[in-house]
Design a protein with these regions (language model features):
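Structural transition elements
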Residues: 336-381, 402-404
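Detector for C-terminal structural segments
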Residues: 319-352, 401-411, 438-549
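Aromatic- and charge-enriched surface segment that lines or borders ligand/interaction sites
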Residues: 86-134, 263, 306
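Ligand-site clamp/hinge motif
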Residues: 233-279
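N-terminal lobe/hinge region of extracytoplasmic solute-binding protein
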Residues: 43-93, 210
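Ligand/substrate-recognition segments at binding pockets and active sites
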Residues: 222-224, 369-451, 519-522
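Surface-exposed binding/hinge segments that line
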Residues: 135-193
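Gly/Pro-rich hinge or "lid" segments in bacterial periplasmic/extracellular proteins
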Residues: 59, 174-241, 245, 255
Length: 549
C-alpha cells in the first residue's frame, strides 16, 4: 500500500531549542493521563483521501478504515484473530475452498452485517467499472483475474452466501497467505443500500456512511486536516474498546507538532524523523516501532526508453549511500534497504532464516552497495549502449522537507557520479505524486510500499508485468515466471515457493528494476499512561486496543 514520509525537518538549532522545552514533557504536571482518560489525540500522517475501501490505495486511508471497519479477521498487534468470522477457517478441497460462519454483528445504523455484504463488496472490488487500482489483490480467488480483465462477470467471482451468516469462498489455486489477506481493507464488507444511495460521493464524506468496526468517523470530508473517530456502540466487541473518542490532527510542521505535544493538545506525536528524531531520541517519551514498508525509486521505462538499460539503473543505485541516507537524512528512523522486501517480515518455513538474509540475498547486496567508481563505469557503458550523451530527468517527489532533502541528496550524488545526468526535482503534494505515477506522467519518482499482508509476494508483485502498481513498467519474463510459480504452481509447496520468491528477488535486485532505498521505522513521542499502541504486520495500529491508565 502506498506510503510516504509526511513530517518536515527543522534546523538543528530550532530542534535544539525545542528539545530544551521537552523537559516539560516528562513533568508529571504535564502528563496526559491527568485529563480525560476516555479521549485521545494523535497526529496524523496525512489527510484521508477516501473512505471507500474499494478505491483506497494508501496506508493513511487504510489506518482510518482499520479504525472504523473490519473484515473476516483482524490483527491485534501481531496476532490474527476472528473479527466478523466466528473462527479462523481451515480450507478444504486441496486448499481451494473456505466455508466461513459469521458472527451476528451490526452496522452502526443497526443493520445486520451479512454474508451478502461481503459478496457485494468483493464483486464491486473486481468489477472493472469500479476502477479499483487494487483489484489485482484478488488474484487467486476463483475467476478474479478474468473478471478484472473484463472476460467474466463480477457475479462469477468465487464467493457466495450460503445463508445470512455463512460464506463460501472458492479459489483458483491455494493462497498461502489467505488468512492474513482477509484482514486487509480491500476485503471489508460494504452496506449495499448505503453505497448505492451515496453513489459517486461514497467515501468522500462521513455523512451517510455506516461502519462495522470499533469506531465511527464523524464530521469529515475529503480535504479536512482534522477528524474524529468516536466509539461505535453497535460494534460486537464494543465492551473491549476503551476509548470513547480519538481526535486526529494532520501536522505538516514539526515545530507545531512539538508545541501541541508540549501543551497537551496531543497525547501522541507520530512519525518523527530527520533532525527532529535525532535530537529527541533520548527523551523518555520517545520510541520507535518497526514497519514493513520499503521506500524506493521508480524509473519510468516506458516514457524514457533508455532506462530499460540494466547498467544505467544499476549505476543510479550504486550512487546511493544508504547508510548515510538513513542516519543523516532520516535521523536513524530508517534502515538501509538492499531489497524491495523488508527485513524481519518473512522467514523460511523450514529453517526460520530471514528472507533478506539468505546467502543469495546477502550476495546480491553488491547491487546496492555504495560504489561511485563502479557506478560511473556502468553508467558510461550504458550511455554508450543506448546512444545517449546526456540524460535529463524530472525527479518527482513529495513536497515535504524530509523528502525534499532526500531528493536533493540523491540529485547531488547522482549528478556528481554519473556524467551527463541532470535531475530536475519536482516537489508536489502526496496526492499529486500518486496521480502522476498512476498516469505515467513522471520520469523518476520516490515511492514506497507498506505491507498489505506480511508475505514477500506482496512486494515482489509490484514489479510484475502489467501490475497496476508497476508505474515504472519494468518487465522481465524470468521474474514474472518465478512470481507466478510462487503464487500458483508451488503455492502448496513451502520449500519450492520459498525458492521461487528468492529467485524472483535475485532477478529484481540484479536488474534494479525498482531501486530500494530504505526500510521505514515509526518514531513517536507518547505521553505517560497512554498504552496499547501495538503495531500490526501491515504497519497499522489497532486503535481498539489503545487506552489510558
Amino acid at each position: 500500500m502506498k506510503f510516504f514520509r509526511h513530517h518536515k525537518l527543522i534546523s538543528v538549532a530550532l530542534v535544539g531549542a525545542a528539545a530544551l522545552t521537552l523537559t516539560g514533557l516528562i513533568n508529571p504536571a504535564h502528563a496526559a493521563d491527568g485529563g480525560d482518560k476516555k479521549s485521545l489525540s494523535v497526529s496524523a500522517k496525512a489527510p484521508i483521501n477516501t473512505m471507500d475501501s474499494s478505491l483506497n490505495t494508501d496506508a493513511y486511508g487504510a489506518q482510518s478504515l482499520n479504525n472504523t471497519m473490519e473484515g473476516l479477521y483482524r490483527y491485534t498487534g501481531q496476532k490474527l484473530k476472528p473479527a466478523v468470522a466466528q473462527s479462523i477457517a481451515k480450507p478444504t478441497n486441496d486448499g481451494k475452498r473456505y466455508t466461513i460462519d459469521l458472527k451476528k454483528t451490526k452496522w452502526s445504523n443497526g443493520d445486520p452485517v451479512t454474508a451478502n455484504d461481503f459478496v457485494y463488496a468483493w464483486q464491486r472490488m473486481v468489477d472493472p467499472k469500479t476502477g479499483s487500482q487494487y483489484s489485482y489483490i484478488y488474484s487467486g480467488i476463483k475467476n478474479a483475474d478474468a473478471i478484472v480483465a473484463g472476460k467474466k462477470k463480477p457475479t462469477e467471482l468465487g464467493i457466495k452466501a450460503l445463508g445470512p451468516y455463512k460464506l463460501q469462498i472458492d479459489l483458483d489455486h491455494p493462497i498461502p497467505f489467505f488468512d492474513t489477506l482477509m484482514s486487509s481493507s480491500q476485503f471489508y464488507p460494504l452496506n449495499k443500500k448505503v453505497v448505492e444511495k451515496l453513489g459517486d460521493q461514497y467515501g468522500l464524506s462521513s455523512k451517510g456512511m455506516v461502519f462495522n468496526g470499533p469506531y465511527k468517523l464523524q464530521n469529515w470530508k475529503v480535504g479536512d486536516t482534522e477528524w474524529t473517530d468516536v466509539k461505535n456502540d453497535s460494534y460486537w466487541n464494543a465492551k473491549n474498546v476503551k476509548l470513547n473518542k480519538v481526535k486526529y490532527y494532520t501536522i505538516a510542521d514539526p515545530n507545531t507538532g512539538l508545541n501541541l505535544y508540549d501543551t497537551n493538545v496531543l497525547d501522541r506525536y507520530q512519525n518523527l524523523n530527520g533532525d527532529t528524531a535525532r535530537q529527541l531520541a533520548n527523551s523518555k517519551e520517545f520510541g520507535t516501532d518497526p514497519s514493513n514498508s520499503t521506500y524506493y525509486l521508480e524509473l519510468n521505462q516506458k516514457k524514457i526508453p533508455a532506462l530499460k538499460n540494466q547498467k544505467l539503473r544499476q549505476a543510479m543505485s550504486l550512487t546511493i549511500n544508504r547508510k548515510d541516507l538513513a542516519n543523516i537524512i532520516l535521523g536513524k528512523t530508517g534502515i538501509p534497504a538492499h531489497s524491495l522486501v523488508p527485513s524481519k517480515m518473512s522467514k523460511d518455513p523450514q529453517t526460520g532464516q530471514d528472507f533478506t538474509k539468505t546467502d543469495q540475498a546477502l550476495a546480491d547486496q553488491k547491487y546496492t552497495a555504495y560504489n561511485p567508481t563502479l557506478a560511473k563505469k556502468l553508467w558510461q557503458e550504458g550511455m554508450k549502449e543506448t546512444g545517449q550523451k546526456e540524460l535529463n530527468l524530472t525527479f518527482t517527489a513529495d513536497n515535504t522537507d524530509t523528502t525534499k532533502k532526500l531528493a536533493e541528496y540523491l540529485q547531488n550524488n547522482m549528478e556528481k557520479d554519473l556524467p551527463g545526468l541532470k535531475l530536475t526535482i519536482s516537489s508536489v503534494p502526496f496526492k499529486t505524486r500518486l496521480q502522476r505515477e498512476a498516469s505515467g506522467e513522471f520520469d523518476m519518482s520516490t515511492s514506497a510500499w507498506n505491507a498489505d499482508y506480511p508475505d514477500p509476494t506482496n512486494f515482489l508483485d509490484l514489479a510484475t508485468t502489467g501490475n497496476p502498481q508497476n508505474n515504472g513498467k519494468y518487465s522481465n519474463k524470468a521474474f514474472d515466471q518465478q512470481e507466478k510459480a510462487a503464487t500458483t504452481t508451488n503455492a502448496n509447496n513451502p520449500a519450492a515457493r520459498w525458492q521461487n520468491m528468492q529467485n524472483a528477488q535475485h532477478i529484481l535486485t540484479q536488474d534494479q528494476g525498482i531501486i530500494p532505498m530504505y526500510q521505514d521505522t515509526t518514531a513517536s513521542l507518547t505521553k505517560p499512561g497512554v498504552c496499547g499502541f501495538n503495531i500490526t504486520p501491515t504497519g497499522q495500529y489497532d486503535m481498539a486496543a489503545v487506552y489510558k491508565k
